[in-house]
């Protein structure tokens, strides 16, 4: 398991005695952080089991120990950094387990590990990377299947912030108003309640913002497009 750092003083003391550090910055409100912490602990355990291991894995709650976050210009979580004598040599930003495993393997090669140890560690890292990739592919497949069902849940589906009775953003509120004024019956999904859907739907439909309107499973667009269609009298023609 990786060591948890609670104060800047703890970090400074460790920095004096350890040349090679892998540090993960996380936050308890960040779901991607939870996923990456599990991978980070797995990589730390693997390194600990290696003879002549010189890597030390540390976990830092970014907002709690902000001195360290600021020192290495950490602006989002999860972020993992690789330090050689306190100097930043590499970083992995976001929930990217395969990239973290790859960079950890590459970083370990700079730590004077014996050739046999390198081979064993590389093999184990590759196995971890392959497993992570398979898990990611399966997870993405399941998410896309879920998204396809959601966009077809109703002939007209609005993915929005909040719900039609209580929209949580101005654009969602305006979109609901336009649909109601045109007599649309529609289902809705509150993307604030599901981070996986919120992030996944952007990639699924290649549309970066919300709200998103779907008719018969096909993306119509966001508020600007809905507004233009309404003003041109074309929105009503899309009603199923």
UniProtKB/Swiss-Prot annotation:
[2Fe-2S] cluster binds at residue 169. It holds the Pfam family Glutaredoxin. InterPro entries: Glutaredoxin, GRX_PICOT-like, Monothiol_GRX-rel, Thioredoxin-like_sf, Thioredoxin_domain. It is found in: Cytoplasm. The keyword Endoplasmic reticulum does not apply. GO terms for cellular component: cytosol; nucleus. GO terms for molecular function: iron-sulfur cluster binding; metal ion binding. The gene is glrx3. Crucial regulator of cellular iron homeostasis. May play a role in regulating the function of the thioredoxin system. Does not possess any thyoredoxin activity since it lacks the conserved motif that is essential for catalytic activity. Its main location: cytoplasm. GO terms for biological process: intracellular iron ion homeostasis. It comes from the Eukaryota. The thioredoxin domain lacks the two redox-active cysteines. This strongly suggests that it lacks thioredoxin activity. Residues 1-125 form the Thioredoxin domain. This is Glutaredoxin-3 homolog. Keywords: Cytoplasm, Iron, Iron-sulfur, Metal-binding. Residues 144-240 form the Glutaredoxin domain.
């Amino acid at each position: 398991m990786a060591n948890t750092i609670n104060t800047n003083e703890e970090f400074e003391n460790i920095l004096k005695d350890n040349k090679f550090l892998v540090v993960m910055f996380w936050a308890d409100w960040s779901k991607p952080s939870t996923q990456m912490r599990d991978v980070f602990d797995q990589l730390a355990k693997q390194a600990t089991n290696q003879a002549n291991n010189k890597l030390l894995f540390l976990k830092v709650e970014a907002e709690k120990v902000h001195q360290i976050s600021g020192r290495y210009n950490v602006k989002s979580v999860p972020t993992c950094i690789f330090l050689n004598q306190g100097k930043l040599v590499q970083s992995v930003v976001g929930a990217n387990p395969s990239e973290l495993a790859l960079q950890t393997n590459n970083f370990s090669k700079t730590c004077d590990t014996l050739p046999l140890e390198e081979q064993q560690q590389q093999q184990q890292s590759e196995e971890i990377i392959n497993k992570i990739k398979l898990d990611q592919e399966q997870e993405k497949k399941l998410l896309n299947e879920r998204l396809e069902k959601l966009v077809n849940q109703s002939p007209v589906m609005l993915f929005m912030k909040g719900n039609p009775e209580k929209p949580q953003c101005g654009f969602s509120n305006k979109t609901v108003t336009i649909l109601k004024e045109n007599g649309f019956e529609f289902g809705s999904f509150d993307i604030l309640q599901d981070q996986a859907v919120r992030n996944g739907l952007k990639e699924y439909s290649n549309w970066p913002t919300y709200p998103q309107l779907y008719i018969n499973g096909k993306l119509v667009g966001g508020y600007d497009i809905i507004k233009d269609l309404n003003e041109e009298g074309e929105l009503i023609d899309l009603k199923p």
